[in-house]
């Protein structure tokens, strides 16, 4: 009934309902029915860091229901969001729109820019992973970094799917995850043959060798990334916008770590931090004091 009335006064009350998985799909459909007049409201909610992540990550799902150039443009704008989880949601929604309507106006230059950004983000994560200490309990951080690198790789392939045939690119992505060396090699060869040089260099530099140091060397040449030490790498994570990586980095800080990192633990206990960061910092501070 609300959907039929299209009374925009309900929009403000409906947006918070997106966080409930039971009703998220229905709420998305209702909000989509309001059409372009409310697009700016939805974008504002997406970029509002004061809103719950569970709400923000459902916003792109509204636009994927509306096959229009305006929807594509809004989702393109959302890819500027620094939070990788939210960027993923925007890219995934664009994939859905392209699957439904390939003739929509996708800004290819902007997709190229984001392909480059995601590739650089991968190598930054790799550079941080490569300098992790082995004498402290940091397994959870190393695992988290690897997971984030895998997620970045998926975003890269989803972006590539906006430039090329989505099914072909998805098949190549799945092949890369195969346990068979031959299947993975075939995927690398396919990417090399299908993609233009300007795009494939950002992906091939990641997938064409399993050796992490060799991979990092290629990334450093490609993006002019400089080597960093352990302390600098940790500070980048602790000052970053990825809550999970911040928490994992905090957890790995032992009593033997540099004073600058101990100070970050103290800072992270304050109430103005996300609950996960605050709780982890409180635990680590107590653990290190008892060490």
Model-derived features: where do they sit?
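Amphipathic alpha-helical scaffolding segments comprising HEAT/armadillo-like alpha-solenoid repeats
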Residues: 5-18, 36-48, 68-80, 99-114, ...
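Short inter-helical turns and helix N-cap capping residues of alpha-solenoid HEAT/ARM repeat scaffolds
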Residues: 7, 19-23, 50-52, 82-85, ...
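Extended alpha-helical surfaces
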Residues: 34, 103-104, 108-152, 159-165, ...
């Amino acid at each position: 009934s609300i959907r039929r009335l299209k009374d925009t006064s309900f929009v403000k009350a409906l947006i918070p309902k997106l966080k409930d998985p039971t009703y998220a799909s229905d709420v998305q459909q209702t909000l989509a029915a309001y059409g372009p007049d409310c697009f700016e409201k939805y974008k504002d909610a997406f970029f509002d860091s004061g809103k719950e992540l569970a709400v923000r990550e459902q916003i792109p799902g509204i636009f994927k229901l509306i096959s229009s150039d305006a929807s594509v443009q809004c989702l393109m704008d959302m890819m500027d969001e620094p939070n990788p989880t939210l960027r993923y949601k925007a890219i995934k929604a664009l994939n859905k729109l392209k699957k439904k309507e390939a003739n929509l106006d996708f800004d290819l230059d902007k997709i190229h820019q984001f392909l480059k950004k995601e590739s650089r983000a991968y190598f930054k994560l790799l550079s941080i992973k490569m300098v992790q200490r082995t004498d402290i309990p940091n397994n959870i951080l190393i695992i988290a970094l690897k997971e984030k690198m895998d997620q970045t790789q998926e975003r890269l392939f989803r972006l590539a799917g906006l430039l090329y045939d989505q099914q072909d690119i998805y098949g190549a992505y799945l092949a890369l995850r195969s346990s068979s060396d031959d299947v993975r090699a075939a995927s690398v060869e396919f990417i090399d043959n299908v993609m233009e040089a300007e795009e494939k260099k950002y992906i091939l530099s990641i997938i064409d060798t399993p050796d992490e140091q060799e991979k990092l060397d290629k990334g450093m040449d490609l993006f002019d990334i400089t080597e960093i030490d352990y302390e600098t790498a940790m500070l980048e994570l602790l000052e970053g916008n990825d809550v999970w990586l911040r928490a994992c980095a905090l957890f790995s800080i032992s009593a033997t770590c540099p004073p600058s990192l101990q100070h970050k633990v103290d800072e992270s206990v304050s109430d103005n931090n996300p609950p996960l960061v605050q709780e982890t910092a409180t635990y680590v501070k107590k653990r290190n004091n008892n060490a």
